[in-house]
Amino acid sequence: MLKIIDAKVIVTCPGRNFVTLKITTSDGVTGVGDATLNGRELAVVSYLRDHMIPCLIGRDAHRIEDVWQFFYRGSYWRGGPVAMTALAAVDMALWDIKAKLAGMPLYQLLGGACREGVMVYGHANGETIEDTIAEARKYQALGYKAIRLQSGVPGLPSTYGVSGDKMFYEPADGNLPTENVWSTSKYLKHAPKLFEAAREALGDDVHLLHDVHHRLTPIEAGRLGKDLEPYRLFWLEDAVPAENQAGFRLIRQHTTTPLAVGEIFSHVWDCKQLIEEQLIDYLRATVLHAGGITNLRKIAAFADLHHVRTGCHGATDLSPITMAAALHFDLSVSNFGLQEYMRHTPETDAVFPHAYSYKDGMLHPGEAPGLGVDIDEALAGQYPYKRAYLPVNRLEDGTMYNW
């Protein structure tokens, strides 16, 4: 029996907050898991320290599925972002340990590689259409084959996805939540213009993506999807609030633009209808928020039966530990579609040294045993936690709205 003898939570803020779980076994092997929940980090810290770690000590680190079921079924209050993020951290760390003991990169334990690398997309944004296209050209020069485009909307003081620091977008900030302003009518007039200009400027050989970030009703989303059809988007993301599964049926009736959703999903029940009825094309659920590698592989297998591909969330609110875990997952599932890749800051990369690398539009997890990522605890300690909130959104008349 390979006993878990220690588990600790490490919180660090090398530019933004990250929560890491580190598990140690009786033979001295360690594994790491990401436990970051953007804007609610300390809730997961408490859940791990107060409710999970006491139950982890003494368990067999080899029994990953059993440990997963113990914490999922045994909690009674199943699911939810806090519990599933904490469970994902445990799951990642145990897979890291198992692959290290096997002396091979995790993707080999998951069935081996289904492809040579993982195609990723970057984020191009700007205050104007021209600025966004200029940023997109930079990604093309770096070899990206897929690029998400976001631009400022005329008449609105701020827009989701647009930041001053182009490569390292981070919406969360300190003190109290920033209040943004939204206008659906202004946005719907502007978005098609962005993609008309982008397709003309960037050509037909690059995949273009766009994130609505839950801002539309189903009929509005159907209209937008129809308007964007001439520009052949790879996907339209989060067109409506993700919990509105039935709403995607109405969108499907009005457009052939591919649809993606799911970064806030924590279990298959959040997307069962979407998958079974083929109401989406890409599932954005993450290793981190969907209960870890163990659970996401089950969801992906179910999606594969219905011709739905994966498109995991991969913004900078996930640490390099999740990025590494996602790449092992991506490389090993047959229905992989695309992986989001927002580059971390140099400070973050220093705290989380990793084996994964980028080349010609693709990431590869590397050949190091385990996840191929670690945490420099001494360096992490130099970046203490800083309270931060995600923004909130209001309509122009002051009504609270979806951010």
Swiss-Prot record:
Binds 1 Mg(2+) ion per subunit. Substrate binds at N38, H123, E263, R284, H313, D317, E340. It is an enzyme of class 4 (lyase). Catalyzes the dehydration of D-mannonate. Has no detectable activity with a panel of 70 other acid sugars (in vitro). NCBIfam families: ManoateDhtManD, PRK15072.1. Disulfide bonds: none annotated. InterPro entries: D-mannonate_dehydratase-like, D-mannonate_dehydratase_GalD, DgoD-like, Enolase-like_C_sf, Enolase-like_N, Enolase_C-like, MAND, Mandel_Rmase/mucon_lact_enz_CS. The record marks A315 as: Important for activity and substrate specificity. One of its GO terms (biological process) is amino acid catabolic process. It holds the Pfam family MR_MLE_C. It catalyses: D-mannonate = 2-dehydro-3-deoxy-D-gluconate + H2O. Its cofactor is Mg(2+). Pathway: Carbohydrate metabolism; pentose and glucuronate interconversion. Its EC number is 4.2.1.8. The active site is at Y160 (proton donor/acceptor), H213 (proton donor/acceptor). Mg(2+) binds at D211, E237, E263. GO terms for molecular function: magnesium ion binding; mannonate dehydratase activity. The keyword tRNA processing does not apply. The keyword Glycoprotein does not apply. Belongs to the mandelate racemase/muconate lactonizing enzyme family. GalD subfamily. This is D-mannonate dehydratase Caul1427.
